[in-house]
């Protein structure tokens, strides 16, 4: 079998799909994208395609090494996202060629189901509470919320009180019937992160995500030393080499690699194993589309330390398309009591409505995240 063609489709809401074709008619799908930089990743995919045409898609490990090491410069979000989508598509092809789901190629099931969590937006506590109530009605009991708005390097107590008040109201409304993680989104610098985490401890969030940016990862062990709350991070780390440093330094209780940003299934399988050796849990980051989610699920079902799976159904970013709009076999993604179950069709197990993909790709939006500024005009982290 040989790779014959690579096609990319930028799609609403903010996704990009990749199709790899072979001379035997087997097609694989991947999802290479950096939200807000889809065109840049698309260019990288097509540049890398020179290494792919005519190659045997079954040699996934060799292809991965060529894509990563053939260029003198490597790593980073753009290249690793391009590699990620290609890698997903290659696993899809291999599973289809052999007639088995990808999790079987990775050693088989280590669990029968995985708990999913849902992101809940809203600027006011009442909006967040209403969103949680709606999701509990369809079986969710685990959520992720914004931990705060933009916050200065040193900010006032009113900002801290406002962030804590939202969490307090949510905990009062639901008690211990739900669990929720708080995503700081890298908006907080180390001095305020210490204060905010301390103030939030009485409300027992499930985890604190990205209390500071990955560039400030040396603060993760320092922050972890001052709190009993689990610290999570990893969506902005792009290879096992990025994770090697934070795992060795300690501090993280949960890692959150993104299978569309961190080299795909091949790389994240290794990252998960590294984390297990450090007694660190895995909760793959996935606010993206169905191919990314399918890739995450195959990893969840073979990694013993996987504990939670993010998914984007109903997320506020999904303007113009919902998670399963491009999927034919929607029933395979059905959840029971907030849990996903293994995808048992060959390959990634996601059947793409290619006709709809082609049509919707004709007018794909160029999504950009907003640019936030502090009251003094300086740029703030979004």
From Swiss-Prot:
InterPro entries: DgoD-like, Enolase-like_C_sf, Enolase-like_N, Enolase_C-like, Galactonate_deHydtase, Mandel_Rmase/mucon_lact_enz_CS, Mandelate_racemase_C, Mandelate_racemase_N_dom
One Gene Ontology biological process: D-galactonate catabolic process
Necessary cofactors: Mg(2+)
EC number(s) per entry: 4.2.1.6
Keyword Methyltransferase: no
Site, as annotated: Transition state stabilizer: 310
Active site: 185 (proton donor), 285 (proton acceptor)
Record-linked Pfam families: MR_MLE_C, MR_MLE_N
Reactions that this protein is recorded to catalyse: D-galactonate = 2-dehydro-3-deoxy-D-galactonate + H2O
GTP-binding recorded as keyword: no
Cofactor binding note: Binds 1 Mg(2+) ion per subunit.
Record site: Increases basicity of active site His: 258
Similarity-based family: Belongs to the mandelate racemase/muconate lactonizing enzyme family. GalD subfamily.
UniProt xrefs under NCBIfam families: PRK14017.1
Known function: Catalyzes the dehydration of D-galactonate to 2-keto-3-deoxy-D-galactonate.
Miscellaneous: Reaction proceeds via an anti dehydration.
Entry-linked HAMAP family: Galacton_dehydrat
Full protein name: D-galactonate dehydratase
């Amino acid at each position: 079998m040989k790779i014959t063609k690579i096609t990319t489709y930028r799609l609403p809401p903010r996704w990009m799909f990749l199709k790899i074709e072979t001379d035997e008619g087997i097609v694989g799908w991947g999802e290479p994208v950096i939200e807000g930089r889809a065109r840049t990743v698309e260019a990288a995919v097509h540049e890398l395609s020179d290494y792919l045409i005519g190659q045997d898609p079954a040699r996934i490990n060799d292809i991965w090494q060529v894509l990563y090491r053939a260029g003198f410069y490597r790593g980073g979000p753009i290249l690793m996202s391009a590699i990620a989508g290609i890698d997903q598509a290659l696993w899809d092809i291999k599973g289809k060629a052999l007639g088995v789901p990808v999790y079987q190629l990775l050693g088989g099931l280590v669990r029968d189901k995985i708990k999913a969590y849902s992101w809940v937006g809203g600027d006011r506590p009442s909006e967040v509470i209403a969103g949680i109530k709606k999701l509990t009605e369809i079986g969710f009991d685990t959520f992720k919320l914004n931990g705060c708005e933009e916050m200065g390097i040193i900010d006032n107590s009113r900002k801290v009180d406002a962030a804590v008040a939202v969490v307090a109201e949510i905990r009062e409304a639901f008690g211990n019937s739900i669990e929720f993680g708080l995503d700081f989104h890298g908006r907080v610098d180390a001095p305020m992160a210490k204060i905010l985490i301390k103030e939030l401890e009485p409300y027992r969030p499930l985890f604190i995500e990205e209390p500071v940016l990955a560039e400030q990862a040396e603060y993760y062990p320092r922050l972890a030393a001052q709190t009993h709350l689990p610290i999570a991070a990893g969506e902005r780390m792009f290879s096992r080499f990025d994770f090697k440093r934070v795992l060795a330094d300690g501090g993280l209780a949960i890692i959150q690699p993104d299978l569309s940003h961190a080299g795909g299934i091949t790389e994240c399988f290794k990252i998960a194993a590294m984390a297990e050796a450090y007694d660190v849990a895995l909760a793959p980051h996935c606010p993206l589309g169905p191919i990314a989610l399918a890739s995450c699920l195959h990893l969840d079902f073979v990694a013993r330390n996987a504990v939670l799976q993010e998914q984007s159904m109903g997320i506020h970013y999904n303007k113009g398309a919902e998670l399963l709009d491009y999927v034919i076999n929607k029933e395979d993604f059905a959840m029971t009591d907030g849990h996903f179950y293994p995808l048992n069709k060959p390959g990634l197990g996601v059947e793409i409505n290619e006709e709809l993909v082609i049509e919707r790709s004709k007018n794909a939006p160029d999504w950009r995240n907003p640019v936030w500024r502090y009251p003094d005009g300086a740029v703030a982290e979004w």
